[in-house]
From Swiss-Prot:
This is Formamidopyrimidine-DNA glycosylase. The keyword Membrane does not apply. Keywords: DNA damage, DNA repair, DNA-binding, Glycosidase, Hydrolase, Lyase, Metal-binding, Multifunctional enzyme, Zinc, Zinc-finger. The lineage of its organism: Bacteria, Pseudomonadati, Pseudomonadota, Alphaproteobacteria, Rickettsiales. Monomer. DNA binds at residues 92, 111, 153. PROSITE patterns: FPG_CAT, ZF_FPG_1, ZF_FPG_2. A zinc finger (FPG-type) spans 238-272.
């Protein structure tokens, strides 16, 4: 599933292309993705300038001059790309936005877990995003904040940093990578972390996410940016997907465990409990 670095990469690839343009028409190739499209995707976003392209958590947001916003969630396999006027519609292209420069914005989603909404902009923070946690790359992620969230829960640290009500956008892959960099065992209870471990974890989360954004995100299967280019952070993965291979730090074997359908990768030597 695309996480914060992938959506940030998508935002960066689309921002300069879209600001100032106008959506002239919306074509739906099916009635629903995760939810029905017609009541959630309205015509208020037509014929008004695009003012901004931004990200909140794993949502891509396109703001319009009439105080409406288009909100996209890529789900498991979504792609949101700019295509030329002569583009031929593909099998899983579900929503087509015609732009006033004759290009097209295409939402493609093989597994159909993605979402495309339009709302009044002020509705987003008040109702839609109100229960989301803080952005991990912001100054709000501090020792005091994270410690206050850990101390009241008897949950493994990996699950805690993946909780979008605490920190947004740190999915399974980036949680595994961040914990390896911080040398913290993923199954260690969050409440048992010392202050220096929490500070090191915050630093590691930021470092991993920043490197992933610089590399254009991680493409394991479906992800591409707005120019249809894949991400290359895959080449920098230290533990994720490397079960049975040697740890780059100590040459111990990378282990894999599974919990609630999620795989966790770690080094038992570097990441002690």
């Amino acid at each position: 599933m695309p996480e914060l670095p992938e959506v940030e990469t998508l935002k960066n690839s689309l921002k300069d292309k879209l600001i100032g343009l106008i959506i002239k028409n919306i074509e739906l190739k099916r009635d629903n993705l995760r939810y029905n499209l017609s009541p959630l995707l309205t015509t208020e976003i037509l014929n008004t300038n695009i003012l901004n392209v931004r990200r909140r958590a794993k949502y891509l947001i396109i703001d319009f001059g009439n105080y409406y916003s288009l909100v996209i969630h890529l789900g498991m396999s979504g792609r949101f790309t700019v295509q030329p006027a002569n583009y031929k519609i593909q099998k899983h292209d579900h929503v087509i936005f015609d732009l006033n420069n004759c290009e097209k914005l295409i939402f493609n989603d093989t597994r159909r877990f993605g979402m495309v909404y339009s709302f009044k902009t002020n509705f987003l923070e008040e109702k839609f995003f109100y229960n989301l946690g803080i952005e991990p790359l912001s100054d709000l992620l501090t020792l005091e904040y994270l410690k206050s969230k850990l101390i009241t829960r008897t949950i493994a640290i990996k699950n805690l940093i993946m909780d979008n009500k605490i920190i947004v956008g740190v999915g399974n892959l980036y949680a595994s990578e961040s914990l390896h960099l911080a040398r913290i065992h993923p199954h260690k209870l969050g409440r048992n972390l010392k202050d220096d471990e929490i500070e090191n974890l915050i630093k590691s989360i930021r470092e991993v996410l920043t490197k992933a954004i610089t590399a254009g995100g991680t493409t394991l299967k479906n992800f591409v940016n707005g120019d249809s280019k894949p991400g290359y952070f895959t080449q920098q993965l230290r533990v994720y997907g490397r079960e049975g291979q040697k740890c780059f730090n100590c040459s111990s074997t990378i282990l894999k465990t599974k919990n609630s359908g999620r795989s966790t990768f770690y080094c038992k030597t570097c990441q002690y409990t």
